[in-house]
UniProtKB/Swiss-Prot annotation:
One of its GO terms (cellular component) is cytoplasm. The keyword Transcription regulation does not apply. Signal peptide: none annotated. One of its GO terms (molecular function) is nickel cation binding. This is Urease accessory protein UreF. Coiled coil: none annotated. It comes from the Bacteria. InterPro entries: UreF, UreF_sf. The keyword DNA-binding does not apply. Keywords: Chaperone, Cytoplasm, Nickel insertion. It is found in: Cytoplasm. Required for maturation of urease via the functional incorporation of the urease nickel metallocenter. The gene is ureF.
C-alpha cells in the first residue's frame, strides 16, 4: 500500500514539475496568434476568449501538437528513435507560421535541457545529440512526450497535462491582452474541464490522415503577428 502510494505521489510530483508555469523555458512570451485576434477585436470578451480556447483545443491542438505528442509518446514506448525524428520533421512542415514554429522548438530545446539532467534515458540523449547536429529541431510537444514517458507517466495523464498547460497559457494571455478579470479566467478554465477530457480521448490514438489539419484563421493571425505595429508577445 505504502509503496503504491509513494509511486503515485512521485508520478504526480513529476507531472506537476513538467507543467510548472515557472519553468525557465519562456512559454509566457508566446501567444501563437492570439495577440492578433485581440488587436483585431475578434477576441474581445470573456465569451469570445472561451470560444477561442475551445476552438483551439478541439479543432487545432488535437490534430497538431496534441496528435504529435501522442504519436511521440508511442514511439518512446517502442524505443523507435527514427520515428521520433520523422515526427519532428513532419511537425516542422505543418507549423506554417514562422514565429509559432520557432517558438515551439525553442521551448522544446529548453525543456529538454532542464529534464535531461534528471532523467537518464538513451533516447533523450540521442535526441539532444540530434538537435545539436541539426538533424531535428526539438519541438515542444515531442520533447514533452519524451520526457513524460521517460518519467514513467501514463499517456492519458501526459495528454491531459499538455492540454491543460496550453489552455492555461492561452487564458492567461487573453486575460492580460483584452483585458479581463482574473476571475473571468478561472471561470473559463473551469468550464473547459469536460473539453480537456474530450481532447485526450480524441487524440489518444490519432488518425495520421488528420495530422496537421489547418485552422486557417489561426495560422493567418499567427503570420500577421510578425508585422503588428505594437506587440507584447514573440508569437
Amino acid at each position: 500500500m505504502a509503496q503504491t502510494l509513494n509511486r503515485s505521489l512521485t508520478d504526480l510530483g513529476a507531472l506537476l514539475h513538467l507543467v510548472d508555469p515557472t519553468l525557465p523555458i519562456g512559454g509566457f512570451n508566446h501567444s501563437n496568434g492570439l495577440e492578433t485576434f485581440v488587436q483585431q477585436r475578434v477576441v474581445e470578451s470573456k465569451a469570445t476568449l472561451e470560444e477561442y480556447v475551445q476552438t483551439q483545443l478541439l479543432q487545432n491542438w488535437i490534430y497538431n501538437d496534441g496528435a504529435y505528442l501522442s504519436l511521440a509518446f508511442d514511439a518512446m514506448c517502442e524505443g523507435n528513435f527514427d520515428r521520433l525524428c520523422e515526427l519532428d520533421w513532419q511537425l516542422s512542415a505543418t507549423k506554417v507560421a514562422r514565429e509559432s514554429r520557432e517558438g515551439s522548438f525553442k521551448l522544446g530545446v529548453r525543456l529538454l535541457k532542464i529534464f535531461i539532467r534528471y532523467e537518464t534515458h538513451t533516447l533523450l540523449t540521442a535526441y539532444q545529440q540530434a538537435i545539436a547536429e541539426k538533424r531535428v529541431q526539438g519541438y515542444f510537444p515531442i520533447v514533452f512526450a519524451m520526457v513524460a514517458q521517460a518519467m514513467g507517466l501514463s499517456k492519458a495523464d501526459t495528454l491531459y497535462a499538455f492540454y491543460y498547460n496550453a489552455a492555461v497559457g492561452a487564458i492567461t494571455n487573453g486575460v492580460k491582452l483584452i483585458p479581463l478579470s482574473q476571475m473571468d479566467g478561472q471561470d473559463i478554465l473551469f468550464d473547459l474541464r469536460g473539453s480537456l477530457v474530450q481532447a485526450v480521448e480524441l487524440s489518444f490514438d490519432p488518425d495520421e490522415e488528420w495530422l496537421g489539419a489547418a485552422t486557417l484563421a489561426n495560422d493567418i493571425r499567427a503570420m500577421q503577428h510578425e508585422v503588428l505595429y505594437t506587440r507584447l508577445y514573440m508569437s
